[in-house]
Amino acid sequence: MPVDISSLLHAGYSNPLLREWQGVRPITKSSLMYPIFISEIDDAKEAIDSMPNQFRWGVNRLEEFLGPLVKKGLRSVILFGVIESKKDYCGSMADSENGPVIKAVKEIRHLFPELVVACDVCLCEYTDHGHCGLLYEDGTINNAKSVERIAEVSGNYALAGAQIISPSDCMDGRVKAIKQKLVELELSHKVCVISYSAKFASGFFGPFRAAANGAPKFGDRSCYQLPCNARGLAKRAILRDVREGADGIMVKPGTPYLDILAMASKLADDLPIATYQVSGEFAIIHAAAAAGVFELKRHVMETMDGFMRAGANIVLTYFTPELLEWLEY
């Protein structure tokens, strides 16, 4: 039976090296950013029940925790503060000198000067109402005051030594305000902004909110995080942040939004594109692997391939410790 020569594909991926050549750039250790939770208790190592192998770490234990990972090739981390007390209307502990993030930035920069430190910037972990910004009396978001406060926190993180500011609050105009604050502080030449541009009001955030003690006390975040089916709004949010001077763009969550990730890589093709494999994605994969549904390593690596194929340069994932091991070989 005659065969159309152009239909013969198997030979092109008939051995492992050829299969590598057929793919896009694979995930590397440099592509990984590890999200870590910093406790207000300096000596803490508190297990997070909903997130296997993840802990809230006190600043005094960061050397014990991060040292082995840095030796394995960890290049960057992103910090999330966790507090139980001293929450207030404006989230004053977010950038307090005695707060977990400021202390952790200084300690990590001292212990591991080669490690790139990013700070998530949001107020939900620190406000008494659990929302990501400041509120009017009727409980709605005061965008202008929120942006002012987010820029203030960002500036203080930069002064403490953070090299990357990552606002996740979803306020309109915050990238421009942060960039202006960095110019004012004469830090705009060495502190970059990777914005959570396309952050969706996702159910996959559940385990994180428990881990960071940052769930809203009333209502939800659907008026400032993007609707899950809103491709057009995501496009506008990405383009807005590019215009406002973002140095990188992030899509969050990861796996359910690969189409948005691919779109971001085209809309902002001259910027680094990040995606966040969030706590719910992490928990689902762990639970399925524990139940014998699939093999953990193979499935995690497949999700990494999906992110890179869709256009990511940076992947935030709680699987970073395992990936540092797997990518060694």
Swiss-Prot record:
Cofactor binding, per record: Binds 1 zinc ion per monomer.
Chain positions recorded as 5-aminolevulinate 1 binding sites: 209, 221
Protein name (record): Delta-aminolevulinic acid dehydratase
The entry's keywords: Heme biosynthesis, Lyase, Metal-binding, Porphyrin biosynthesis, Zinc
A Pfam family per the record: ALAD
GO annotations of cellular component type: cytosol; nucleus
GO MF: porphobilinogen synthase activity; zinc ion binding
Family: Belongs to the ALAD family.
InterPro entries with a match to the protein in the record: ALAD, ALAD_AS, Aldolase_TIM
GO biological process: heme biosynthetic process; protoporphyrinogen IX biosynthetic process
Cofactors: Zn(2+)
Residues involved in Zn(2+) binding: 122, 124, 132
Gene source species: Schizosaccharomyces pombe (strain 972 / ATCC 24843) (Fission yeast)
Gene3D superfamilies from the UniProt entry: Aldolase class I (3.20.20.70)
Binding site for 5-aminolevulinate 2: 279, 318
Role, per record: Catalyzes an early step in the biosynthesis of tetrapyrroles. Binds two molecules of 5-aminolevulinate per subunit, each at a distinct site, and catalyzes their condensation to form porphobilinogen.
